[in-house]
Curated annotation (Swiss-Prot):
A GO term from the CC aspect: cytosol
Protein's gene: csrA
Function description: A key translational regulator that binds mRNA to regulate translation initiation and/or mRNA stability. Mediates global changes in gene expression, shifting from rapid growth to stress survival by linking envelope stress, the stringent response and the catabolite repression systems. Usually binds in the 5'-UTR; binding at or near the Shine-Dalgarno sequence prevents ribosome-binding, repressing translation, binding elsewhere in the 5'-UTR can activate translation and/or stabilize the mRNA. Its function is antagonized by small RNA(s).
Protein name, entry field: Translational regulator CsrA
Organism: Shewanella piezotolerans (strain WP3 / JCM 13877)
Alphabetic keyword roster: Activator, Cytoplasm, Repressor, RNA-binding, Translation regulation
Repressor listed as a keyword: yes
Main location (coarse class): cytoplasm
This protein's record includes keyword RNA-binding: yes
Pfam families from the UniProt entry: CsrA (PF02599)
InterPro entries: CsrA, CsrA_sf
Annotated compartments: Cytoplasm
Protein family: Belongs to the CsrA/RsmA family.
Amino acid sequence: MLILTRRVGETLMIGDEVTVTVLGVKGNQVRIGVNAPKEVSVHREEIYQRIQSEKSGSAPEGGNF
């Protein structure tokens, strides 16, 4: 895992077309903005897991959604 330090307003690049910008920090929460082409899906991990569970027809681990 690559670990980076960024300040509010700073950006990192993923490949040539995806940018992740730190928008704000408040306590233990970090707000980030992601710019990516329409063909690149961007989801929070728990949403991605739900989508994958629904595709396979199984219930997600950890409870009901």
